[in-house]
Amino acid sequence: MFNLCYKGQKLQRIVQSKRMEEPYFTFGIIADIQYADKDNRLNYLKTSMRYYRNSLTQLKVAIKEWATESIKPKFILQLGDIIDGVNTKDNSSTIALERVLEEMDKLPIQFHHVWGNHEFYNFSREYLNGSKLNSRARENRIDQQVGTSESGETNDESFYAYHFSPFPKFRFLLIDGYDLSPIGREKTSLKYDISFNLLKEKNPNEDLNSPTGLEEEQFVLFNGGISPSQLDWIQSILTSSDKKEEKVFVVSHLPVHPDAADTMCLIWNYPEVLSMLQSHPCVVGYLAGHNHEGRYCMDPSGIHHMTFSGVIETPPESQAFGTMYVYEDKMVLKGRGLVEDRTLHYRDPKNMQVGH
């Protein structure tokens, strides 16, 4: 009898231990696919090869793995630059996008899309707002807490940002890094004028994509900034999450910390954005793409800044995507190929420091 009771208690402990190890939820992450039906060629800086056709193959591999994982991801974060700007040279942008979305549609899991510079090389904001890349539209239908813009409209001055909660006490906040940007605005808009004038003030180079000689290297045309209206909106969401004691992941195409990317890849007004994020104890992570080599840092306040390797510059023999396992006290990244495995513990609000 004693032996049977002992075995029963041991089995119960094993079951409880296994249950404790199960994550609250998981989600997939992939960045900078930049698909095009084009031959391989060097990137803009001539420092790395771009594998245009293979990027679609890489996506197929990622989708197959997510589909067969024992714990199905609740959603996938697509961190921007889904197709490459080179598609505009032969008017193949729509065809290229359809090919990528066709593969994504094979996975019965919601994709959340952020918009990067290559989205705006290929399409207007008006087009993007009406496309499948507007994952905000779906959230608007199921969650009345989703933010759209300062006016709640998708007009030419609005920004593409929203938030959602996949599990109690967790929230994802997708922000628009090209809210202020000449490439993301119609030339007739007020934000275009503001963005272009700011860029010219900070960057006197003839080639506005060049950071040569700049004191603030982030002020190049392929980056963008966060407007005061979007900053106010972000502030309100984070303040609400602080009160609810939520854990918030901020998601953007552009990184925001100088140790998580080259300075020439950061949001224009990253010091302002970073300072605001660090002041809110709810923020636990910042997920971005854009800097294709990928990078990671934990800032002094305890926020984990993860910049994911770009699929477009991943050699055919490797991979670049990951799955995040979210627990009560930590998040565990299972990376593939160029994306490293990481165990990331949440910051302690009692020991918060603010600093870059």
Swiss-Prot record:
It comes from the Eukaryota. It catalyses: CDP-choline + H2O = phosphocholine + CMP + 2 H(+); ADP-D-ribose + H2O = D-ribose 5-phosphate + AMP + 2 H(+); CDP-glycerol + H2O = sn-glycerol 3-phosphate + CMP + 2 H(+). Its EC number is 3.6.1.13, 3.6.1.16, 3.6.1.53. Zn(2+) 1 binds at residues 32, 34, 81, 292. SUPFAM superfamilies: Metallo-dependent phosphatases. Keywords: Hydrolase, Metal-binding, Zinc. Its cofactor is Mg(2+). Zn(2+) 2 binds at residues 81, 117, 253, 290. GO terms for molecular function: 2',3'-cyclic-nucleotide 2'-phosphodiesterase activity; ADP-ribose diphosphatase activity; CDP-glycerol diphosphatase activity; manganese ion binding. Monomer. Belongs to the ADPRibase-Mn family. Hydrolyzes ADP-ribose, IDP-ribose, CDP-glycerol, CDP-choline and CDP-ethanolamine, but not other non-reducing ADP-sugars or CDP-glucose. This is Manganese-dependent ADP-ribose/CDP-alcohol diphosphatase. It comes from Xenopus laevis. The lineage of its organism: Eukaryota, Metazoa, Chordata, Craniata, Vertebrata. The gene is adprm.
